[in-house]
Design a protein with these regions (language model features):
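Extended interaction regions within the primary functional domain
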Residues: 50-54, 60-61, 72-73, 104-105, ...
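Hydrophobic pocket/interface hotspot
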Residues: 43-54, 82, 98, 109, ...
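Beta-strand/loop substructures that line and gate deep hydrophobic ligand-binding cavities in soluble
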Residues: 2, 28, 110-150
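Structured, soluble extracytoplasmic/luminal domains of envelope-associated proteins
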Residues: 78-132
């Protein structure tokens, strides 16, 4: 009988340890990547601010060339929406919705997919760089809120 009690106590300690570790894990995650281009700011803004050439720049398409993309709402600007569906389990289905756009400064998309977390956002920030500010530095930042990690 004492062996059973020891086993139950050990199991409770392991469960408590997992809960404590889960409480101390970060509640949010941010991933950022920057690239610099010599394209004009207006071209960069048009390319990232609409879904007409989404296949040319988004990584989802390179992971699954047969992905199905469907747009709705306005062609560009706030409210434009792209829904995707893939047969690959790692991609699945979801959507990108443009929620904020400041020309020449930033574009913010709200993401909805099967991945863990809430309030998923993809923010593109534009900054003029180089001699005479002819280049554009594009910083893509993905943020997600995991809440309680238990």
């Amino acid at each position: 009988m004492t062996r059973v009690i020891e086993w139950i106590v050990s199991l409770l300690i392991v469960i408590a340890l997992f809960v404590v570790i889960g409480l101390f894990l970060p509640a949010t995650r941010t991933v950022s990547h920057s690239v610099e281009t010599n394209r004009p700011m207006s071209t960069v803004n048009d390319l990232v601010g609409s879904f007409t050439r989404f296949r040319d720049w988004n990584g989802l398409v390179s992971r699954d060339p047969r992905i199905q993309l469907t747009t709705s709402g306005p062609e560009r600007g706030v409210g434009a929406k792209l829904e995707f569906q893939s047969t690959q389990g790692s991609i699945g289905r979801g959507s990108w919705t443009l929620v904020e756009g400041v020309p020449g400064e930033k574009i913010v998309y709200e993401l909805d997919n099967r991945a863990r977390g809430d309030d998923k956002r993809m923010t593109f920030r534009f900054e003029r760089t180089g001699q005479r500010n002819q280049n554009v530095k594009i910083t893509q930042r993905y943020t997600v809120d995991y809440g309680w990690n238990i």
